[in-house]
Amino acid sequence: MASTYSFDIVSDFDRQELVNAVDQVIRDLKSRYDLKDTQTTVELGEEKITIGTDSEFTLESVHNILREKAAKRNLSQKIFDFGKVESASGNRVRQEITLKKGISQDIAKQISKLIRDEFKKVQASIQGDAVRVSAKAKDDLQIVIQRLKQEDYPVALQFTNYR
C-alpha cells in the first residue's frame, strides 16, 4: 500500500477527436444548403484552426457547427480561443482559433492556492503546465477533485495519472 496517493491536474484534449470534429464540420459545410456556395475553408493546424469564408454571418454559423461537433465528441468549449476576425482578399473574412493546451502559471497558482487554503491535509505542487496533488488518503483527493469541478477556470481541467 502506498504511503501517499496523488493525481495530476492537466488541461489537454484528445487530438483525434478534434480531427474528427473538424472533418464533420467540413462535411456539414458541403452538405448544408445555406453554406454550400460560400467557399468556406476550415483548416486544422498543429495549434490552431483557420476558418476562411465570405461573411461574418457565415463565420458565426461555422462557429456554431464547430462548437456542436466538438461537444458531441466530449471536447470542452474552453479549448477554443477565438481570435479576431480579419479581412482577407476578395471580400472574404478569416479567423484563427487557437487551441488552448496546458495550464498557465497564473491558473496553476490559483489552483494550488485554493487547495492549500481549503485542504490542510493535501499538498499541491506546480510541475510545468500541470499541477500534482498528493495526500495520504484517497478520500481527500476525491474531495479536492469535486471542489475543483465546482470552480470555473478559463481552461478545461482533466484529472489524470492517479497513483
Curated annotation (Swiss-Prot):
Entries under CDD domains matching the protein: YajQ_like
Gene Ontology CC: one annotated term: cytosol
Pfam families assigned: DUF520
Keyword Nucleotide-binding included in the entry's annotation: yes
Keyword annotations of the record: Nucleotide-binding
Entry keyword Nucleotide-binding: yes
InterPro entries reported in the protein's UniProt record: DUF520, UPF0234-like_C, UPF0234_N, YajQ-like_sf
Matching NCBIfam families: PRK05412.1 (NF003819)
Similarity comment: Belongs to the YajQ family.
Function: Nucleotide-binding protein.
Protein name: Nucleotide-binding protein all4662
Organism: Nostoc sp. (strain PCC 7120 / SAG 25.82 / UTEX 2576)
